[in-house]
Amino acid sequence: MPISANKYFLLVGVFIGDKMKKEAAKLNEDYVVENAAIQRLKNLGYSYKHGSELTPEYNERESYRDAILKNRFIKAIKNINPWLTEELALKVYKTVTNIDNPDFNMRGKIFYEMLINGVKLEFKENGEKKTRFVKLIDFENINKNEFLVANQFEVEYYYENGRFRRPDLVVFINGIPIAIFEFKSPKSNQTAKDAFNDHKTKMKDIPQLYQYAQILVVSDGLETKYGSPTSDWDRFFVWEGVESDDDVEVIEVDNYGNTMYKYKGNPYTSLDILLMGLFKKEHLIEFLEDFIIHDKKKIIATYYQFYTVKKAVDRTIKSVLYGETPEDRRIGIVWHAQGTGKSITMLFYAKKALKQKELNYPLLVFLTDRLELDEQLYNVFSSVFSEAERAESIAELQELIKKTPGGIIFATIQKFGRKSKDEHYPFLTDRNNIIIIADEAHRSHYGTLAQNLRKAIPNASFLAFTATPIDYKDRSTFLVFGDYISAYPIDKAKRHGVVVPIYYEARLVELHLTNEFIDLEFDEISERVANDPETKESIKEVFAKLEKIMLTEDYLSKVSKDIIEHFNKRLQDFDGKAMVVTISRKVAVELYKWITKQPNAPKIAVVMSGNKSKDPEDFHPHIRTKKELENLAKEFKDPESDLKMVIVVDMWLTGFDVPCLHTMYFLKPMKNHSLAQAIARVNRVFKDKPGGLIVDYIGIADDLSKSLSKYSSEARKDLMTDIKVVIEEMKRRYEKVTSYFKNINYKDWKKLSSEDLSLLTVKAYQRVAKDDNTKKEFVRNVIALKKLYLLARPHPETIGIKDDLEFFEMIKKMIVKYSTKKIREISQDLENDIQSLISKSISAKELVDVFEMLKKEKPELSVLSDEFLSEIAKIEYKDYVRDVLIKILNDDIRVRMAKNPIRFKKFSERLNEVIEKYRIKVITTAEMIEELVNLAKEIRKAAEEGKELGLTEEELAFYDLLLSYPNIPLTDKKRVEKIAKEIARMMSGYIKARDWKKKKNLQSKIRAKLKIILMKEGIKDYSLINKISDDLFEYAKNIYAI
């Protein structure tokens, strides 16, 4: 069951105390989330001010366009930097508030450098030129900083005068807006995603506020996420910890991902957990200092990265300061599932560890087991740490370790090897602040090479990161690195939306080859040798028999044809990329030739290493320089590029992220973590990608099962889901949906005339329109069926249900069209992740139902006319009639209220009353239809009163507004009519001007004219004139909404 808004409101009382609960009851429900957040932050020691108190009038800032609270800022930096004079503090303020760069991201980066490193200040003291850095935040003495939370903080548009935006909540540290919150009420029809969209809108209008923000938070009370100002929605994360990454228990998750938690025995919402975890003062300061990096965008840590790095650094300090034996210098192992940002976690670790005083500027040596991985990791780090070194040889590594006082070095593990068995690896240094950090630390050779590491650097400490589970049967990894520091498994990552699920499909099973070879004792090439094509080829002789079969014309013909047919059908549903994994370079080249012969083959490339002076001539087009490979990788990663498919052998199977990659075809036997790493290429989050698909042409499922048998059942289950499971669930859901339409023949609906089809859909609509619960259930089932269909495509089982699914989609669209906002919200939420896919594959055609057909047949009739209402009421399917009438009235009232709320607001309230009476079964369907028809007639009559008075629609709106003021000295309605006409006539001249609503000079003229008209009619009270003229102007903006 979904978590209810009522449950949220109930828990608010638990979270914020009885006093606040009583106060919350008095508040508009729209502000419940906001006020709960304020109270939680006050409990955490934050000061509070309403935004109306942080204005120029209160001397908090110079203008509404300013985002930094000037006086608080100057007071804080003088407190943190006692040597700072008032004059110099003002100079710092001007520097921070005048960041000169046209690019929003660059302004954010420049400010973050000021925030962390201080503001460079050049000044003269006693005639001597000096340079010092001014701290904006005291990261060491937290209590020296001022923490302030403010709601409804009003900021003027950056590019336009007189228009304002008010973020729901802003957290200031020392007068600087560090975090911005947007909320939606849990009882509204909007969600946290809508709050995210609000951020994006406000960011365009008031960028001068958002350029300082490091954290954006969105919440509807039930779902809460945070991200950076440059994050897309799929990079907004949950926060699921208070003091560590495992101290919060999930007690309830609904269909939309909304979560309830338990912490120390008490229930909490997601918003409370985020505030208690991330916005605890000590945590927030630490987060700002150590867990934000700028690359092309601002990247901020997830909760599991934050707590993991904190623990890893604490253990590092203990190891360096107190580790007397090799066992004491084992820091531990970080296991974070594939696709969850392991490289970024390592980067945050480096950033934090390097500045720890206890470590005395340590030397961090990052080790990988392949040149490709070494280069990838180095490239990630070098954009942040320009001083990072990369060892190209054993001798260079030894020299760097001897001479480098501290910093970062990258190398492959093989550089700790020996050229011959008789050679001894030399002693390098006895420093104790060298940290060996292994990437993917479960290769068997770490145990052997660790001996050389210990001899060379006897006092080094050891830390490991891995993306696949460690084999508990092989204790060598734990003997070298220690036990787990943190584990972030794939099931959590999927629940948090950090990765997408992976599905498995076996195709051309008759061609599967590995069963007879599965027991061959071969090591993965990527684990055993350096990046040398000749050496690789000699080892690959083990695969000779397999390769020979795969090079036959029959095999290549069948596989190449099937790959292209399968992938092109996938592209019909969602755009993206594919990767084909082959056993050898020869198979890769031959398969490329066959694939490019296929009709409608996409643009494709082979990615492999080689040497043109030694390799066969047909290899040459596929052997690229380093720069050419970089350009090819860039092209493949670009979702908009024409390069849709690559064929690989070993390269790009680990550490290579292509979020738009959604399909992998395997023609290569793989084992253990190498297989787990390879298939994880397709689990990256990208827009509305529903999942990744592994297509097996060789039999890796058996190998995967054997390889993962040593891991927990959870790890095996979460790694991959067989497409057969999806097919079975699709069939079950299909049967569920068809059960709504028993004895209705819809199978040949595409052959029906428009009139017959409209009658059929209304008949089908009647079956699912009994009540809101039935409608919700139907909508959920159809959307679930669509998702399963998309995941299963292009499996043959999907062909038979495609037409039926399109019919179900038509009925679902009718339900959403003629139903309450809540049902529309459910549909929007559930389909959010597949929105762009639907139109490509299974979108229902635009249906002209009975109501739409009636409007087409009799376009001269108003939808509120007696004749039209009579025609609608004659339709035999009364649930449909009821919903259509509600839709007509809702739409009509909404349009009329926008222009004349005074006259038509009462009808909106009446409509809601009728709907509520029906909901609680006070009236029947027939009685409800009768009341709705009567209400429609009253609305029509109210609208026609203007004609009887000789007033246009616009004049009537002004007329109603003027009559609504009880103390206006106008008792003669004829005089009011005259004023309304004069106002409308005056406005007709101004509205012709382009952008009249935005031009300040025109607005001033209009307001002045309105005041003159009112004074001319005998209104003397100037405050009343101001009030009425302001209201009339706002009315005019709605009336003339052009």
Swiss-Prot record:
Question: Which keywords are on file for this protein?
Answer: ATP-binding, DNA-binding, Endonuclease, Helicase, Hydrolase, Nuclease, Nucleotide-binding, Plasmid, Restriction system
**Reactions performed catalytically:** Endonucleolytic cleavage of DNA to give random double-stranded fragments with terminal 5'-phosphates, ATP is simultaneously hydrolyzed
| Presence of keyword Ribosomal protein | no
CDD domains linked to this entry:
DEXHc_RE_I_HsdR (cd18030), HsdR_N (cd22332), SF2_C_EcoR124I-like (cd18800)
Q: Where is the Helicase ATP-binding domain?
A: 323-487
Ranges for domain Helicase C-terminal? 551-731
Q: Name one GO biological process term.
A: DNA restriction-modification system
* Motif DEAH box: where in chain: 439-442
Hydrolase listed as a keyword:
yes
Lineage, top-rank taxon, reads: Archaea
Name of the protein this chain belongs to: Putative type I restriction enzyme MjaIXP endonuclease subunit
Q: What is the lineage of its organism?
A: Archaea, Methanobacteriati, Methanobacteriota, Methanomada group, Methanococci
